[in-house]
């Protein structure tokens, strides 16, 4: 009976946490609204075949091939096969141009931008993680300067180089030869290219909904939809051929470069033979966009999942430990200021205004003092956050600031629960506490997906790289204008007690389900 009662209570908590002050009518409507960009992309893709051929632009059947060879190197001797008359010169220049591309565009330019931002302009916060100290760094551990931290450098400055290196490693193992094709590899590539392509965004969305602040999932949906809409419009406006087309018909073919050309499943035909079906073959024959190689939306979708999993997964910081002594003290000026004008009166649930380039005066959140403004705003429990230049210079070295009475007031979050350290320090939670699992699966998935697309002969490295650029651009836009200023800042205000939580948004979905239990900390990114 106890098991049945516990199961029933869990189901009830899941139901209530899912609705969260909504009803069964508004919940589906809210879901449709949040995922509207994704539905718009799917609608455009499905109806692309209705566009009259006379209105469509010319097909660029050679561009992706040459861009791949001269930007990433001709390791498969493709130029020798397709253009045997100029083999030696083209092979030499492919490595000269790819080396120049690597050095100039993937190393020097990102390094110059990083140096300009952090050493010339002296920006003292993570450009893409305004609240990095709050979400990602242990409270009592001394940190390196913000500009030298791995999180600051890796996203976005080192990502192009990371992509180039991994793509070429994957390219080596995806060589198009019968000797390289095996049943195991075929099925693994099919699983990644088809199954994970459909399920990974869903699993990422579930993770963000369960473990992250309300609104994070909407940002993921909008970032995904924005990049995919831009991608499918690029397919329609600048159509390019996939590698299977070049390998099947040759680089100089013109007969099949037209909009009546049927799609081709390429390496997935081998999977059909293994499984005894024709699903992949028939599915690609009916594709409404045959010449939609650049950008690769398989790469863009996988990379968007990667970006959100890597950037949002957090480690355990013992902020709400029942052992005491775990007060948040940040010793550097690397976290975005929750300014006075962002504080709201009781009952005011408006979203903080969008932060623009002219508003980027950063203050250390760990040195912001809660100021009692009850005399200024009648009967308001809210607090205002403000740090003047004088306060900045007189701040305590431990991350607190010294007020007029000479007292230090460290930043304090509202305790929604107390973490049982005897429970959270068990060996079973060690890997989870470091936030390692989401990052590991994100990296593994993107590496596997890039390999699968090349192994199945569906995309060049160039296609995949452009897909990464689309994903990064979409992520930066949504992160800058929505996620950081409108979602995370608002949520931190609520957790600080500065904003009244009238919509039960202080807790994540997982926290609501396990509210009052020993597992609540597990779903709290601030814990």
UniProtKB/Swiss-Prot annotation:
Major location category of this protein: Golgi
Q: Which protein are we looking at?
A: Inositolphosphotransferase 1
Topological domains annotated Cytoplasmic? 1-24, 121-152, 212-219, 310-435, 483-527
Q: Name one GO molecular function term.
A: transferase activity, transferring phosphorus-containing groups
**Keyword annotations of the record:** Golgi apparatus, Membrane, Transferase, Transmembrane, Transmembrane helix
- Its source organism is Saccharomyces cerevisiae (strain ATCC 204508 / S288c)
Q: What else is known?
A: Present with 606 molecules/cell in log phase SD medium.
Tell me which domain of life the UniProt entry assigns to the organism this sequence originates from.
Eukaryota
Describe what happens without this gene: Fails to accumulate M(IP)2C and instead accumulates increased amounts of the precursor mannose-inositol-P-ceramide.
PANTHER family per record: INOSITOLPHOSPHOTRANSFERASE 1 (PTHR31310:SF8), PTHR31310
